[in-house]
């Protein structure tokens, strides 16, 4: 999947790309690629991760909240709230640290991957 995330100034597109990065990280933890995002969170690989993580239950809840927001944005055309980006970045960072520990990324590779989500959103284009 190799999802890269970078703020473009389009909140909907930025949010969907951030969710794709989270989804890729779940796959790298061992969740089946062909599953839905919800099924990936319920997969044995995700459950093993939650059980091994000190904040596992809270992290699971936060990821489900992100999935619910994603569904509302995609299916109900809900607006993307500003908190979604900081929450998504934090969740992606925690998942990335887990896949680094499992050897799927080197520290340098992981740092490069997280440099994009840490970048601020570009300014909106000037009105014509």
Provide a role label for each language-model segment:
Residues 1-68, 72-126:
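Amphipathic alpha-helical interface elements
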């Amino acid at each position: 999947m190799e999802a890269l995330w970078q703020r473009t100034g389009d909140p909907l597109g930025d949010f969907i790309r951030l969710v794709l990065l989270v989804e890729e990280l779940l796959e790298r933890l061992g969740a089946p690629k062909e599953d839905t995002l919800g099924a990936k969170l319920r997969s044995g690989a995700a459950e093993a991760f939650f059980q091994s993580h000190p904040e596992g239950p809270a992290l699971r809840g936060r990821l489900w909240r992100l999935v619910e927001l994603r569904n509302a944005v995609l299916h109900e055309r809900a607006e993307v709230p500003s908190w979604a980006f900081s929450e998504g970045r934090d969740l992606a960072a925690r998942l990335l640290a887990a896949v680094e520990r499992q050897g799927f990324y080197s520290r340098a590779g992981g740092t490069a991957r997280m440099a994009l989500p840490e970048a601020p959103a570009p300014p909106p284009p000037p009105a014509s």
